[in-house]
């Protein structure tokens, strides 16, 4: 039984990589990340990079976000974003296609923290309870899969809205419920 986010994310990523290996004989590939440096890159092709996950290289977690906003984030979100470097991964959950957000490099980690700060500032301004995004919905520009910072639940939220739907009781369970999708 998988009991922590780091293990659950590692297990899912392994399944994702295995699916790509089975379908193509190569690691996962991305056109969006072409030209963006990362230790994950195993080879570069014609406007495409192939990647494999790498250990997260920094000691710090999301401390900059916590200090900037005087907030304590759920331990699960720290583990989600600081256990590995990888490309974003296409997944399905209950028939919906999502893009699971990952950290690609140390520079990307800085951008992620800036985006989380912006997300949390917007929520505070709109008097919404704090969340940290983990995925985007491919079918809905405003739909975001997030971790509720108060309860630790995984939710679907409409950006800037009070509309929220609980998807899973915790991040470990959610990572165990999503399925990898092969998309070129």
From Swiss-Prot:
Protein topology in the membrane: Peripheral membrane protein
Keyword Magnesium: no
Sequence intervals crossing the membrane: none
Cellular location(s): Cell inner membrane
Keyword annotations of the record: Cell inner membrane, Cell membrane, Membrane
GO cellular component: cytoplasmic side of plasma membrane
Entry protein name: Protein Syd
Organism: Photorhabdus laumondii subsp. laumondii (strain DSM 15139 / CIP 105565 / TT01) (Photorhabdus luminescens subsp. laumondii)
Gene giving rise to this polypeptide: syd
């Amino acid at each position: 039984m998988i009991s922590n986010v780091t293990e659950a994310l590692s297990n899912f990523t392994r399944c994702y990589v295995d699916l790509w290996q089975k379908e193509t004989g190569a690691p996962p590939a991305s056109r969006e990340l072409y030209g963006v440096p990362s230790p994950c890159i195993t080879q570069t092709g014609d406007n495409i990079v192939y990647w494999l996950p790498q250990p997260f290289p920094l000691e710090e977690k999301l401390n900059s976000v916590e200090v900037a906003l005087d907030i304590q984030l759920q331990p699960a979100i720290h583990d989600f974003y600081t256990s590995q470097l990888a490309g974003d991964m296409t997944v399905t959950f209950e028939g919906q296609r999502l893009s699971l957000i990952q950290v690609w490099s140390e520079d990307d980690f800085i951008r992620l923290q800036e985006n989380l700060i912006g997300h949390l500032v917007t929520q505070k301004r709109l008097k919404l309870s704090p969340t940290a995004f983990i995925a985007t919905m491919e079918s809905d520009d405003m739909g975001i899969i997030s971790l509720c910072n108060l309860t630790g639940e995984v939710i679907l939220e409409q950006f800037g809205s009070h509309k929220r739907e609980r998807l899973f009781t915790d991040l470990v369970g959610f990572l165990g419920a999503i399925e990898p999708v092969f998309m070129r």
